[in-house]
Amino acid sequence: FHIKPLPPVIVSLDVSIYDSSSYEDGITVMDRLGEGIIYAINIHGDPVWFVNSNIDWSNGGTYLIQFSHFLPDGGFIGIADGRSGNLSGRAFEMGIHNNLIWEGPGDVDNNGVHHDVFPMPNGNILALTIKDTLVPIPDEIDIPEEYSYIDSIPWHGDRIVEWDRDGNEVWSWSVFDHFDMQDFVSESYESMFTPPNNPTDFFYDWTHSNAVWYDIEDSVVYLSVRHLSRITKIDYPSGNILWNMGKSMPSGDVTVGNHLGLSGQHSVKVLDNRNIM
């Protein structure tokens, strides 16, 4: 057998704290955002496995892969980031030997799949995508005189999509259908009009969700909405919101956990004890 040369970023890893009484057994899987390398290390920081982005995609494109979840058969799913080649991000499944097993649709709107994908029990894949909607500038926003000719700005909002393994969309959910648009962060909105920003490049990154999780016991989807500092619990498949947890907003729709101090959280996960992390 032979061993592939290790990427330099893996070779340079060091363990700074090692408490054998507290460490969880097993290996730790990580990826390098923007570098297209997924790797695993043991308790000593030694690399035991890695895969890279040298993959033959059906469209001949170039993508940087990111890890999301392991599957029961030992493979894993993740996101293929195509922005460096002006391609939409897509979901994928790989085996541990760098073999591509499945490619999600590659023609998704805007930047395509972003941040997270999740394996459904039936084999389908949940993914985060983006939808654009042109929205009038809110009355409470004061914009500089030089931009007074602008009356509307595109809002980026998140859309959860479920695909079967043939790439068919079988379920979807959009923040534009379920969130109150008076819930937004005015400071980040106003920052778009700060020189040297170019008005032709304006869009408001309204929700910027970064994680999605399906819970089979309750048949619900959890969505982590970073820019609203909110976790949303969604009934599946009806799409009705059961609750919003996090920072209070003008709509009054956030009724759980206002005291928790959520601020730009980056994940949501249901633990084995049914708590939410």
For every predicted segment, state its role.
Residues 1-277:
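Histidine-/acidic-rich catalytic cores in large beta-rich domains
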